[in-house]
Design a protein with these regions (language model features):
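Fe-S-dependent hydro-lyases/dehydratases of central metabolism
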Residues: 1-309
């Protein structure tokens, strides 16, 4: 149980984790207990492979655009299929994190060898998945008692969601033109190490447009430090990015960089509800970090394909 609506990010590790409000969280802290109605589980079967400059964020936005924000009806989603098995852990975190935008109580991915390796590299004395057979971590037969969704990643292209809902998502090339005053790469869903690398791949040897502010808030200090060691942070700063502290910050409308009434922002965050990132008059588009970086270069909504290294 977590005190944030994006607590389901931990589903990437096979944990059934969901967010609750302050009152319920206080009760959990006091008693160590909470109540939960066992939900149905809907299967999201991901086939194929992600193409150039297309990421887990594009998968979620495509699902939001196709099925809306009540796709899961506050029940559980399990992401599965060969595309999920091939995904690195940070991409899996993005899928489970934004299951909330699909109306899910929790998003889950069954643990596998990649999960075990990730956990062993970070907490070898506390977490051992090999204490149990692989079948222990797999979904039970018949457990997907809800709806079945499928998405062919071979045909997926970079997505963007227009204001003021993730459900307004469509292929970038299907949207009307849009100009931006702010580009934001941040939040738990859009500024992990792989996200920073993707943005740097677009911004290397390029500069941001004079009409736009590029703001970057890495998802964690550990990811920021590793990105710095790899030269990623230097590429972002050389392109014109201002690096902000690792915090929720602008994603929740906090801090001195919150959006003004006349700002139009393209953001790698999870939500673009009216007023979420600042003034109610501001407008927020959602996209992958690579697409945000591409927009930072041109100042406009831009397909990132062909811009990477």
């Amino acid at each position: 149980v977590g005190g944030d609506s994006h607590a389901p990010a931990c589903g990437a590790f096979g944990a059934y984790m969901f967010g609750v409000g302050a009152t319920d969280m206080a009760a959990v802290a006091a008693t160590g207990q909470t109540w939960l109605k066992v939900p149905r589980t809907h299967l999201v079967d991901l086939q194929g492979e992600l193409g150039a400059q297309t990421f887990a964020k594009d998968i979620i936005l495509a699902l939001c655009g196709a099925h809306g924000m009540d796709m899961a009806g506050y029940e559980a989603l399990e992401f599965a299929g060969p595309a999920v098995s091939a995904m690195p852990m940070r991409a899996r975190m993005t899928l489970c994190n934004m299951s909330a935008e699909l109306g899910a109580q929790a998003g889950v991915i069954a643990p596998d060898d990649m999960t075990a390796e990730w956990l062993a590299s970070r907490a070898p004395d506390r977490v051992r998945l090999d204490d149990q057979p692989d079948s222990y971590w797999a979904s039970d037969a018949g457990s997907h008692d809800g709806r079945h969704f499928s998405l062919d990643l071979d045909t997926l292209v970079p997505q963007a969601a227009a204001p003021h809902s993730p459900a307004n998502a469509a292929a970038i090339t299907d949207h009307d033109d849009a100009a931006f005053s702010v580009a934001y790469i941040g939040a738990c869903t859009g500024a992990k190490l792989d996200d920073l690398r993707a943005a740097a791949g677009i911004l290397k040897r390029r500069k941001t447009a004079s009409s736009i502010r590029l703001l970057v808030a890495p998802a964690s200090r550990a990811d920021q430090d590793q990105a710095a060691c790899e030269g990623v942070m230097g590429i972002l700063e050389d392109a014109g990015a201002t690096v902000l502290p690792t915090a929720c910050g602008m994603c929740a409308g906090y801090g001195p960089n919150r959006l003004a009434a006349d700002d139009v922002c393209i953001s790698s965050t999870a939500r673009n509800f009216r007023g979420r990132m600042g003034a109610p008059g501001s407008r927020v588009w959602l996209a992958s970090p690579a697409s945000v970086a591409a927009a930072a270069v041109t100042g406009r909504l831009t397909d990132p394909r062909g811009m990477g290294n």
